[in-house]
């Protein structure tokens, strides 16, 4: 049986895992759960699930467009950011083409590019940050897209508005810059980029957002892209019909209106990242300053060798060997009770 070698050579996605009895804090899910308004909207919509969903997602696109002060034709809703990445690669990548990104970042950029036979050219992080200058050096005549995850997954680090703009000015305007802002809702740094402003100045910019994190809808698989209408239209042509289910659409629309859930999530994340950052530092444990809903910290040994022990004590975190960071862990910021339990577990480690 002849199968495509580019598919056979791909590595399977490694998700965050857990075990029975442990609290799962390995996948950056919202510790408060889904928006109550979203749950109510899903319950109300259940009697209509025998009908096909709105294949254009026009209601949701219009509401997202209102938040961004853009027309709906600048918005594409899809079955999570993963599908958006595949649609992006579908319209840009052929065998012989390449994309540029960071090595220690979200693996689905690599997956989407290789799925269509392209080459992923990667630059290692520089002090935990995207090496933007180094990434520019990887561009050649076959480069179609550059991926920037800001804040970065799994480090939680970010490039500032000035740094990102300097980078965008150097990127040839025929190369798409895909700015993944899955965690941008959590960013509170004063110099964090305003991507809406950047869209006006850089027509080759595409922004990715998700409902999985701050809105707590990871199980419904829904995300969106913001870009020039011509680009959005091309991606829409590559999408499967009815790719976003009706429950995801109504939940997302309701979640957008739930300011109480959003504000509560932000309060928890901002309070607990400060608490945990200070406590890890007291213990001599290095962690990156985070602008996301997780914190990335380092131990003296490979996390894979102690993951089961930590999970057995009650916390399932993410070991980062698949990211090329075997001695680092990514921990979703949970409640104070969960975070204190993590610290207790770390205190009990024979060596850190």
Regions found by a protein language model. Name each.
Residues 1-51:
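N-terminal "arm"/small-domain region of PLP-dependent enzymes with the aminotransferase-like
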Residues 50-98:
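Phosphate-binding glycine-rich loop
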Residues 114, 132-141, 154-177, 181-212:
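Active-site pre-lysine segment of PLP-dependent enzymes
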Residues 162, 309-313, 317-318, 322-352:
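PLP-dependent enzyme catalytic core of the Aspartate aminotransferase-like
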